[in-house]
């Protein structure tokens, strides 16, 4: 799926707002993901055996959260370019062995959309939920085609 220049600008702007406090945003995303889907926590080696409340301040969790958010940053940077397909293939290859499939990417997208919405609401910034939801549907489909 291709996104308009305005949509790309919107998601990148929202993303910049989130990265102002990347650690807090990352913890919130994973908190939402695991609250909604507790069984997903076992798919993350860095999070196994940790209470969701213990993610914050755990060096292994922090490292993995930054990796995940870095991957999202790569996707946003590659929107509407051929590089996006390369990223999708890589992510599919990295996640399939752990059973992280299209549905898990959709659910992660929902957690990210909720966290971004909360962050934008607190800062008074605009948030285009429909564009973000379309983006994560596209991401899940893009990765899913290689699994």
UniProtKB/Swiss-Prot annotation:
GO terms for cellular component: extracellular region; hemoglobin complex. Heme b binds at residues 64, 95. InterPro entries: Erythrocruorin, Globin, Globin-like_sf, Globin/Proto, Mb-like_M. Keywords: Heme, Iron, Metal-binding, Muscle protein, Oxygen transport, Transport. Signal peptide: none annotated. Disulfide bonds: none annotated. The keyword Iron applies. GO terms for molecular function: heme binding; metal ion binding; oxygen binding; oxygen carrier activity. Residues 2-147 form the Globin domain. Homodimer or homooligomer. Adapted to the low-temperature environment by a decrease in the oxygen affinity via an increased ligand-dissociation rate. At 2 degrees Celsius this hemoglobin has an oxygen affinity similar to other hemoglobins at 25 degrees Celsius. Belongs to the globin family. This is Globin. It comes from Aequiyoldia eightsii.
